[in-house]
Amino acid sequence: AVAAESSTGTWTTVWTDGLTSLDRYKGRCYHIEPVAGEDNQWICYVAYPLDLFEEGSVTNMFTSIVGNVFGFKALRALRLEDLRIPPTYSKTFQGPPHGIQVERDKLNKYGRPLLGCTIKPKLGLSAKNYGRACYECLRGGLDFTKDDENVNSQPFMRWRDRFVFCAEAIYKSQAETGEIKGHYLNATAGTCEEMIKRAVFARELGVPIVMHDYLTGGFTANTTLRHYCRDNGLLLHIHRAMHAVIDRQKNHGMHFRVLAKALRMSGGDHIHSGTVVGKLEGEREMTLGFVDLLRDDFIEKDRARGIFFTQDWVSMPGVIPVASGGIHVWHMPALTEIFGDDSVLQFGGGTLGHPWGNAPGAAANRVALEACVQARNEGRDLAREGNEIIRAACKWSPELAAACEVWKAIKFEFEPVDTID
C-alpha cells in the first residue's frame, strides 16, 4: 500500500489503469525485516522507477515519497530512515553553489575548522547595535558571524538596515585583521521575489555569504537562491529550523540524514548538523554518519552509523557541517576531534557570554581552536588530553582563562531521543 500510494495506486481500480503500463511505473517493496526488540515494527525497502520524478526537483521527489502515504489510517506510524539517490538522478541536480574547496579558496583559510558566532539576543537589537556586535566578534578573531534563523525583517530591525551595518562590520574588521570575514545575512522572506531582492542587495554590498532557512522557506525557494548564489559568487549558509518537528521522533516522520541528502541536492554550502556535545539533539555515530553524507563523495553502507545504502554523489560538491548550539571553549577539543577541519564551529552564548565582552569572547574561542589544532598536528590525543591542552593555553591567554572559569561547570548531559538502536 505504501509503495502503491506513492506511485501509481489509489484505493480502487480505475478504468484509466488500462491506458498506461502500471508495471513500468509502480513502486515496489522488495524487502521487509523486523525491527529488533519491537513486536509490531518493520523496516521496509521500497524502490521507485526514476521516470516518476522530475529532474532536479527535490520538491517533486518529496511530494511523491513522503506525501499522502504518511497520513494513511492503516498505519500507526511511518518513518523514512534513508534513501539512495542513484547517480542517474543525482546528476540532474547542481548541488551546492560552490562547495568546500571553493569556499576555502575564497576565504584563503586552510588547515583548521572555521569559527562563527550567532548574534544574541536573536531578536530585539537595533541594526546599529547588531552591527556593532558583529564587528566586535569578527575583530576578536572569528571568521563569521550569523543572523539567527528568525531574524528576517521585523519592526525593530529591517533587513536593509541590518545588511548595511553588518557589511560595515565586515569591511572594518577585515581592514584591521587582514583576514577575510563574513556574516550570514539571512535572505529568507515571505516570497521568492523578496528573497532574491535581499540576495541582490547583499551582492551589491560585496559581502561573501548569505543565508536561508531551507525547511521553512521550502525547497523550491532554496534551489532558486542556490542558482542565484552560484551565478553571483555568493556562498550560501543553510539553517535547518523546523527539522526537529519532522525528524526527532523515532517512529514517525523522516530522519535528518534524508533532509541532509535533500539539502545537498537542492544546494547549500553550509548546514547546521548538531554538535554531539552541545545543547541540541545528536548521537555521535549517527551525527558522523550524516556529516559524511554531506561532505564525502562516496559513502559506504554502514548500519552501525544509520547509513542504510551506499551513496555515490558522482563528484557533487560537498557541504560543510556547522556545529552550533550550547557549545563553549571546553568543548573545543571534542569538536575539533569529531568534526575535523572541514566544519564551522559556531558559538553564540559561548562568545557573547564572555565576562569581558564580545571581542574577548571571540579571542578566547580563536585561541582555544588554535591550541587544539596545533596539539592535533603534533600527534596529541584531543579526546584524552583535551582539558590539559585548554588549561595550558590559558596560561598565555587571559581571555581564554576567563572563559574557562565562567563555563567550567556548564554541561548538557541528556540522553538523545533519536538513537541508532
Swiss-Prot record:
Keyword Lyase appears in the UniProt entry: yes
List the CDD domains hit by this protein, alphabetically: RuBisCO_large_I (cd08212)
Q: Which cofactor does it need?
A: Mg(2+)
Q: Mainly localized where?
A: plastid
Q: Name one GO biological process term.
A: photorespiration
Its Gene Ontology molecular function terms?
magnesium ion binding; monooxygenase activity; ribulose-bisphosphate carboxylase activity
GO cellular-component term (any): chloroplast
What family does the Swiss-Prot or TrEMBL record give for this protein? Belongs to the RuBisCO large chain family. Type I subfamily.
**Record protein name field:** Ribulose bisphosphate carboxylase large chain
What taxonomic lineage is listed for the species of origin?
Eukaryota, Viridiplantae, Streptophyta, Embryophyta, Tracheophyta
